[in-house]
């Protein structure tokens, strides 16, 4: 089928070709050198690599995809979507692989940064890896820890490529500005080479000590404050300031979520096709991340009241926080 510059009228099936991400002979040599009955975790990793083999899908859209729904669903991400669309256009009718410059999404919590990354993976037809930097204290989470250490394991990048099906997954580094780690180890140190196309092609995880090709990974980092991010990282990414959606956009997001939740559940048919303007106005006061929980609460309250219409009184109170669990002083 021709892949000329033809307007796309619907979703396109991604084009996939195979890409080798590691050298089988190198893995075999490493496995053969392991002492008997030692380094069982490392032995299992090498065996898993040999069993699955080095070939992974490298995917890209088979043409310029229709992105109207994404523009509608993510109104505060238009500049990012514009750049993604341009980079897809460059490779859509060529033999070139898809290249997307690493993205850094800056903005307050709850504006949809992580949701955008999931939608990007869906748009491109690839997988997604996720690292929540704020919840981690181990500095080796991205690049792995030496197999000499007790409890060591491969890093998230290695796992996404070796255990996954794709050579070019979307890799999300969430809340990169909150990266912790031991004082003697920079948890973001491995990103300096991973975010550079040339050096990422020969990335060596410290646990497996086998080079893997991470050059095709599509990087999406999220953060609230750029001041906490090292300058070498900022120099390697395209930075986007993501604002909270305005009132009109927030109402559209709320309406789309209502329709999506209603359509995803059999019980949804018992509710009105669209919510009232007053309910949407109330929902628009919430951050996008909070809207789904609020709709589920509202649907449940309406059902308990034996109604098929969601009313303002069904919505949770604005600013209501979950009570902490544990002792109080």
Report residues per predicted region.
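Interdomain "pre-motor" coupling segment immediately N-terminal to P-loop NTPase/helicase cores
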Residues: 12-65
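Conserved C-terminal "switch" segment of AAA+ ATPases
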Residues: 56, 165, 226-232, 243-309
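Pre-Walker A (pre-P-loop) alpha-helix and adjacent loop at the N terminus of AAA/AAA+ ATPase modules
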Residues: 61-106
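Walker A/P-loop
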Residues: 98-133, 162, 231
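AAA+/P-loop NTPase substrate/partner-engagement loops
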Residues: 123-153, 160, 250
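AAA+/SF3 P-loop NTPase mechanochemical coupling elements
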Residues: 165-168, 203-222
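Conserved catalytic/switch belt of AAA+ P-loop NTPases
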Residues: 173-212
């Amino acid at each position: 089928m021709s892949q000329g510059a033809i307007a796309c009228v619907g979703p396109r099936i991604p084009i996939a070709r195979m890409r080798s991400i590691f050298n089988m002979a190198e893995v075999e040599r490493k496995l053969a050198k392991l002492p008997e009955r030692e380094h069982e975790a490392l032995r299992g990793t090498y065996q898993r690599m040999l069993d699955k083999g080095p070939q992974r899908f490298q995917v890209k859209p088979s043409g310029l995809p229709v992105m109207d729904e994404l523009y509608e669903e993510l109104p505060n991400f238009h500049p990012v979507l514009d750049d993604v669309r341009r980079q897809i256009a460059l490779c859509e009718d060529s033999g070139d692989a898809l290249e997307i410059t690493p993205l850094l999404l800056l903005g307050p919590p709850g504006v949809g940064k992580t949701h955008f990354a999931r939608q990007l993976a869906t748009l491109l037809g690839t997988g997604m890896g996720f690292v929540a930097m704020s919840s981690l204290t181990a500095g080796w989470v991205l690049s792995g820890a030496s197999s000499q250490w007790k409890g060591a394991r491969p890093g998230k990048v290695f796992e996404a490529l070796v255990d996954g099906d794709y050579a070019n997954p979307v890799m999300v580094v969430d809340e990169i500005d909150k990266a912790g780690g031991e004082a003697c180890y920079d948890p973001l140190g491995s990103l300096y080479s991973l975010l550079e196309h040339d050096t990422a092609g020969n990335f060596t995880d410290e646990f497996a000590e086998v080079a893997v090709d991470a050059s095709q990974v599509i990087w999406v980092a999220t953060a609230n404050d750029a001041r906490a991010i090292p300058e070498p990282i900022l120099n390697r990414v395209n930075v986007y300031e993501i604002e909270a959606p305005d009132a009109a956009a927030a109402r559209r997001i709320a309406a789309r979520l209502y329709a999506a939740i209603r359509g995803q559940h059999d019980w949804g048919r018992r509710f009105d096709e669209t919510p009232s303007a007053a309910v949407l106005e109330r929902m628009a006061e919430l951050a996008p991340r909070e809207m789904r929980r609020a709709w589920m609460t509202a649907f449940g309250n309406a059902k308990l009241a034996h109604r098929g219409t969601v009313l303002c009184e069904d919505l949770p109170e604005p600013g209501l926080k979950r009570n902490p669990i544990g002792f109080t002083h």
